[in-house]
Amino acid sequence: MSKKFAEYSQFDLSKVNKDVLKKWDENQVFAKSMTEREGCPSFVFFEGPPSANGMPGIHHVMARSIKDIFCRYKTMKGYQVKRKAGWDTHGLPVELGVEKSLGITKEDIGKTISVAEYNAHCRQDVMKFTKEWEDLTHKMGYWVDMKHPYITYDNRYIETLWWLLKQLYKKGLLYKGYTIQPYSPAAGTGLSSHELNQPGCYRDVKDTTVVAQFKMKNPKPEMAQWGTPYFLAWTTTPWTLPSNTALCVGPKIDYVAVQSYNAYTGQPITVVLAKALLNAHFNPKAAELKLEDYKAGDKLVPFKVIAEYKGPDLVGMEYEQLIPWVNPGEGAFRVILGDYVTTEDGTGIVHIAPTFGADDAQVAKAAGIPPLQLVNKKGELRPMVDLTGKFYTLDELDEDFIKQRVNVDLYKEYAGRFVKNAYDPNLSDQDESLDVSICMMMKVNNQAFKIEKHVHNYPHCWRTDKPVLYYPLDSWFIRSTACKERMIELNKTINWKPESTGTGRFGKWLENLNDWNLSRSRYWGTPLPIWRTEDNSDEKCIESVEELYNEIEKSVAAGYMQSNPYKDKGFVPGEYNEENYNKIDLHRPYVDDIILVSKDGKPMKREADLIDVWFDSGAMPYAQIHYPFENKELLDSHQVYPADFIAEGVDQTRGWFFTLHAIATMVFDSVSYKAVISNGLVLDKNGNKMSKRLGNAVDPFSTIEQYGSDPLRWYMITNSSPWDNLKFDVDGIEEVRRKFFGTLYNTYSFFALYANVDGFEYKEADLPMNERPEIDRWILSVLNTLVKEVDTCYNEYEPTKAGRLISDFVNDNLSNWYVRLNRKRFWGGGFTQDKLSAYQTLYTCLETVAKLMAPIAPFYADRLYSDLIGVTGRDNVVSVHLAKFPEYNEKMVDKELEAQMQMAQDVTSMVLALRRKVNIKVRQPLQCIMIPVVDEVQKAHIEAVKALIMSEVNVKEIKFVDGAAGVLVKKVKCDFKKLGPKFGKQMKAVAAAVAEMSQEAIAELEKNGKYTFDLGGAEAVIESADVEIFSEDIPGWLVANEGKLTVALEVTVTDELRREGIARELVNRIQNIRKSSGFEITDKIKLTLSKNPQTDDAVNEYNSYICNQVLGTSLTLADEVKDGTELNFDDFSLFVNVVKE
C-alpha cells in the first residue's frame, strides 16, 4: 500500500509546537544533534548565564532565538555544537530580593539573622523560577543543555574563579587601594565602572544647586576695596560643601574680580570667577549701571569688573571654612591648580571635597590638602557621610574627636540626615532635601550667590535604581588598565554585529578603561581568596581548595585552628567529582572562619570582600568546565575555547562582553569569543520600555500558547535586524502566521492533495534539468540562488536577511508564481513526464525551504520536512535538525532565465496595479500592453516571456515601441533634495534643462543611467537616481513606470472582450460552487443557467470553454432555474444549477 502525504483539516501552529516537542523529547533529538556529530569539527558557543530569581520575559525569547538560530545552522552544516546552560546565582539582585522577602536590610544581617541563614535563603531564592525558565526554553525551542548547567555558586565553579584571580595576582594585576569609588548606599556596596555604565544608569535628574561664596582670608588689595571679597564656586551636590577643604582653578583660565551685590541679602561683595562665565552670572544689561544706585530687591544687579588674573595668580590664596561644622586640621582652605577645571559650566572654580570625588582626592593629595574626616567610636577615620548615605550622628563619633574638632551647636541640627531623600525610608521626593536645607542656611548667612534647580546627568545603582555616591573605599582592584592596549588590539579581531558596537560603544569603553573595582561588601557571592595578617605584613592568595586544605593543615599545626573543617567533612583533595565538592561550602561565613598562618607564624584572616558578580559570569568559559583542574587539554587545545559565537543584549556590552574579554586578555592573552551579536531592546509597539507596572509587558507563555513559537520567532527575527530595537506588536505575529506560514502551509497542502491523488512518492529518478519545462528550471534556479544567499546570510550572522529572503521566495516565487502558473499541470489526468517534473520540482522546493527555515522556525520546519520524507524516504534522519543544510548547485542556476522571469513578474505586477487603479478584474480580458523598450536586452527578456505575461495579465497582445517614437510621452522631474546640494547655484539652470529634455535624451538617460548637459560651456551630469521619470496617460490607456521599465495598458473594453470576461467570471463562480458543495476534484457536473440578455451571448459563444474548465458535461440555458444558486454581478444577477453526474 502506497504511503500518503499528511493532510490536515486545520492550520494550528500551537498544536504543531506541542506535537514536535513531544517528538523531540521522545526521540532525544537534541542529544542526537550532538552525538551524531561526534568527531566532526566543533563550533563553540557560550551561553551567558541568566538569573533564575526573576521570571523570563518576551525579550528573553528574542535573545535565545538568536543564539538558537546559529547553533542549529552550524549543526546542519556538519559541526558539533555543544551548548551548556548556565545560571548566574550570586550578587546584588539576589540579595536585594531576599532582603525584601524577609523584610530586612543589610544592617540586620549578622544581627537578627545569621550570615549562614541569610545565604541559605539566597541559595534557595536564586533558583526560584528555574522551572519557568526551563519551561520557556523548552516551549520556544531553544536547544541548550539544561540538565547539566554550570551554576556560579557551585564550589567547583568558585575554585576556577580563585585560580583565575591567582593568575592575576601572580602577574601583579591584583592590588588593594584606598580610593574614591562609585558606591551604592541603597545596596551597601561599591560598584565597578562597567556596572555604572549599564544602560539607564545615568539619567537626568533635577537637583538644587548653589553658587557658593567662599570668603577670602588674604585678598589682593584691589579685591578688598568694595564689600566682602569671595571666591565663587558652583556645585550640584550642596551636601558635600561641609566637607570642602580646597578650591581649584585652571592653569590656563582667565579670571576676573567683580564688584557687585548679593542678590539675596543686598550686601556689597567682590567676587572672583572665570572671565568666560561672567555673563552666565551677571546680566550684561546691568554693566552700565552704577553700583551706588542699587537698592535691595532691584531686578538688575549692577556689576563692575576691576581686575583680571590667570589661574596661577590665585594659587595659595586662603579662605574661611564655608560650613565650619568639623575642623579638618592644618593645610586646608587654599586655592590650588587642577588641569581638569573647565569653563563649560559653573564658575571656573571647583569646590574640592576630597572624600567625595576621585578628581578632588587626586588634586588635593598632590597639593597637600587634607580631606575632612571624622573619627568613629572604633577610632577609624571616616568621611562625614556613613555607608548608609547619612551624616554621622554625634553618638557614633569618638568623644575626644568631638571635643577637639566638632562644632556641636552647628553640626547637631544636620547630624543623622541622609544626603539624598532616596536613601531615607521615611522621606519622599516631595520632602525637603538636605541640599535645600543647606542652601537655605547659606542664603541666610550671605554664603549663597545663586540657588537654582538644575537638570544634570547623575549615576544610579543598576539594581536599586537609587543615586550613587562617590565614596572613599578600601577596595581590591584588577589593574585592567595595564592590559588596555592589548584589549583594544584583540577587540579588532572580533566580528561584531553590528560592527559599530565593536568600534563604538565597546571600543570607546576600552579606550577610556579604568581599573576594575573587584570588591563587594556583601554576603552572597564568591569570596575573595586573599588572607592577610593584621599588620598587612604578609598575604596569601589561594588558587585552589587543595591549596587551602594544605594551608589549613599548617594553621592547625600552628594552633590557630582546632581542626581542618574540610578534612572533618571527608573532603578529599584532588577528587573532582560533585559528591566530594558538595561536602564543603566555599561561601561566607564558613570561609571567614578559616584562619591561616603566615611565614613568620602570624595569624591571617580572609579579606572580608566578595568579588564582583560580573567576574563570575566573565569567567564562565573556564569555570563551566572546572578549568584547569579538569578538562585542561580541551581548553588548551582550543577545542572548547574561544567561542566561535556568543550573543546577548546590548546592555551586556559593558557587562558580560567586557568581563569575558578582560579576563581572557589578562589571563590567556586571547579573545574569548570570535563573533558576537549584540541584540537590541524589545520595546512595546509605541517604542516604550516594557514593564509590568505600565501594563505593556507581553507574556511569552501565553503568546506561544496562542500562536506557537515559530511565528513569534520569525516575527522577531525578520521584523528588524537583531541589533536594532524591536517595537513589539502582537498583530505582527498574526501577520507572519498568515502571510508566511499560512502560504507555506497552503503550498504544501496543494502538493499533498494532488500527490496523494496521483500516488507520487518520489521513487522515480530525478528528471534531468534539460528535460524539464522552462518554468521548472526557473524555480530550481531561483531556489539554488536562494540556498547560496541564505547560507551566506547565516554564515555572516545576518538572520533577518535570511528570513526575509525565504519569505520572499515562498510568497512571491513559489506560491504566487510557480504554483499558481502550474496548477493545471497537477490537475491534469494521467501521470506524464511533465506532471512528474512538476511534482519533483515542487517537492524539492518544499524540502529545501524546510531546511533553510529550520534554524529560525524549528517546529514547522520539522513538521514539513517529516511530512515530506516520511513518504519519500529520501533521508534517513528523524528530524530536519539532524539533516544536512542544502548545498548550492551552480549547474542548476540559469541567471538569464531568472532575469527573464523577473521581467515577467515586474511587468505583471505593474499591469495588475493599473487594472486595480480602474477596477478591472483580471478575468476581464484587455486588448494590448505597449512597452517602450530601453535596449535590446530588455526587449529580449520580455520577448522570452511574452506569452506568460499575456496569460498572467489577460491581454491579447504586447506591442514594443521605440522609446522616442512619441506614442508614449515621457517627462522628467528633478529631485531637489538630491540635486540641490549637488549643483547649488546652478540648480535653477539644471532644472530648466531637465524640464526641456527631449524624448531621445530621456531614452539615453534610461539606458545609460546618466545624462550630460551643456550649461553654457559647463558640463552638468545628472543620474537616473536624481530624477523621477514618468509617462503621461493617453486617452484609453494607463501608464506606469518603475526604473527602466515603462508599460502602457489599453483599458478600453470592447463587446468581444466583455463576452470573454463574462465567460471567465462564470467559470470562477462555478468552481467556487463545486468547492463549497464538497465535490471531488475529479467529479463531473451538469450545468443549467438562467437566461439573461447580459450573459446569453457570452454563454453561447464560450459554452465549450466553460464546460472544459469546470468539468461540465453540458451547459444549458433555461428561462427559469429552480433550486439554483444566485450569482450577483455589478448590475444584474442570474441563477445556476450544478448537479454532479
From Swiss-Prot:
Reaction(s) the record says it catalyses: tRNA(Ile) + L-isoleucine + ATP = L-isoleucyl-tRNA(Ile) + AMP + diphosphate
Q: Which UniProt keywords apply?
A: Aminoacyl-tRNA synthetase, ATP-binding, Cytoplasm, Ligase, Metal-binding, Nucleotide-binding, Protein biosynthesis, Zinc
Q: What is its EC number?
A: 6.1.1.5
Q: Which GO terms describe its biological process?
A: isoleucyl-tRNA aminoacylation
Subunit field text:
Monomer.
Q: Give the protein's biological function.
A: Catalyzes the attachment of isoleucine to tRNA(Ile). As IleRS can inadvertently accommodate and process structurally similar amino acids such as valine, to avoid such errors it has two additional distinct tRNA(Ile)-dependent editing activities. One activity is designated as 'pretransfer' editing and involves the hydrolysis of activated Val-AMP. The other activity is designated 'posttransfer' editing and involves deacylation of mischarged Val-tRNA(Ile).
Protein's name according to its UniProt entry:
Isoleucine--tRNA ligase
| Source organism per UniProt | Bacteroides fragilis (strain ATCC 25285 / DSM 2151 / CCUG 4856 / JCM 11019 / LMG 10263 / NCTC 9343 / Onslow / VPI 2553 / EN-2)
